[in-house]
Amino acid sequence: MKDLLGLMGKAKEMQAKFQAMQDEIATVESVGQAGGGLVSVILSGKFEMKSLKIDPSLFKEDEVEILEDLILAAHNDAKAKVEQIMQEKTKALTSGLPIPPGMKLPF
């Protein structure tokens, strides 16, 4: 019974830590760039786009597809950075816990 109560206490503690981590990640902003900085995107930790900057030299009718590709690449770059931050924080929080590799935690 003592072990069960201890386990339940640890579960509540972990839940509180995960919530704090999620709150912290929500405040993170990540910058993604493409085209050597011609396009940049800022994403929040919740993957909301906060900013999009495009160099005016890209506003040419015959370069629309290039611009579209650069916007997508910048967004994906920022998204990958946010995901990396989330992974690092989750790993630090769960170190020492018997969690199977590759298990996605509730985010």
UniProtKB/Swiss-Prot annotation:
Short name of one Pfam family: YbaB_DNA_bd
GO molecular function: DNA binding
Keywords: Cytoplasm, DNA-binding
Keyword Cytoplasm among UniProt keywords: yes
InterPro entries (UniProt xref): YbaB-like_sf, YbaB/EbfC
Disulphide bond pairs: none
Broad class of where this protein is predominantly found: cytoplasm
Localization per record: Cytoplasm, Nucleoid
GO CC list: bacterial nucleoid; cytosol
Family membership noted in the UniProt record: Belongs to the YbaB/EbfC family.
Complex formation: Homodimer.
Xref: HAMAP family: DNA_YbaB_EbfC
Role summary: Binds to DNA and alters its conformation. May be involved in regulation of gene expression, nucleoid organization and DNA protection.
Protein name: Nucleoid-associated protein mlr5504
Species whose genome carries this gene: Mesorhizobium japonicum (strain LMG 29417 / CECT 9101 / MAFF 303099)
